A protein has these predicted regions:
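Hydrophobic core
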Residues: 18-26
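Bacterial N-terminal signal peptides that target proteins for export
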Residues: 2-17
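Hydrophobic small-molecule pocket/channel-lining residues, especially in calycin-type beta-barrels
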Residues: 25-182
């Protein structure tokens, strides 16, 4: 029976009630149960020490920029938003992959730099690395390693290094101390 063209004996109110009841039954039957929250494992929380609004200082104590790291996607990823005093801006997306059991970071900046790092927590430090072409000579393969280490005072040290001899020696590209912004 077409309820919208129901005989007058049912009346329009009865027809609309029947349509509403039918829609509610279909809707109630098709609603999936709320899924368990993803990304709640201990491993997913390993990089949370980096979350916050930071002022970043170089080794000599001079402020070199600001960084905001926030949890996104219901806590499944970290979004980094860097603003350097030299005009460099960049963002990274960081996520723990439960399949390969490693952390992944994809960094892009306004200079066209793309870094795709992979790593894990080593002791208390997050260590990510990549092997790829040298920024100064694309014909030469280099290793890059970035280590984030939380300190007892709540600050975080970020050390970015490069090796062109398969990890025998390392050159520091960036050494920053993150202090929570006030």
């Amino acid at each position: 029976m077409n309820f919208l063209r129901a005989p007058r004996r049912f009346g329009r109110l009865a027809a609309l009630s029947a349509v509403s009841l039918s829609a509610a039954c279909v809707s109630a039957q098709s609603l999936p149960e709320a899924p368990a929250k993803a990304c709640q494992s201990v491993e997913h929380r390993q990089f949370d020490f980096w979350v916050g609004h930071w002022e970043v200082f170089g080794p000599a104590g001079k402020k070199v920029g600001e960084n905001r790291i926030e949890l996104i996607a219901d806590g499944c990823a970290l979004l980094e938003q860097w603003t350097g005093h030299g005009g460099v801006t960049g963002k990274s997306l960081n996520i723990y992959d439960a399949v390969d059991r490693r952390w992944h970071q994809t960094w892009v900046d306004n200079g066209g730099t793309l870094l795709m790092l992979v790593g894990r927590l080593v002791d208390r430090s997050m260590v990510m690395s990549l092997t790829g072409p040298s920024p100064s000579d694309p014909k030469v393969a280099v290793q890059q390693r970035i280590t984030w280490t939380p300190a007892a005072d709540g600050s975080v040290r970020q050390l970015w290094e490069l090796s062109s001899d398969a990890g025998t020696t390392w050159t520091v590209l960036f050494d920053g101390r993150y202090v929570r912004a006030r």
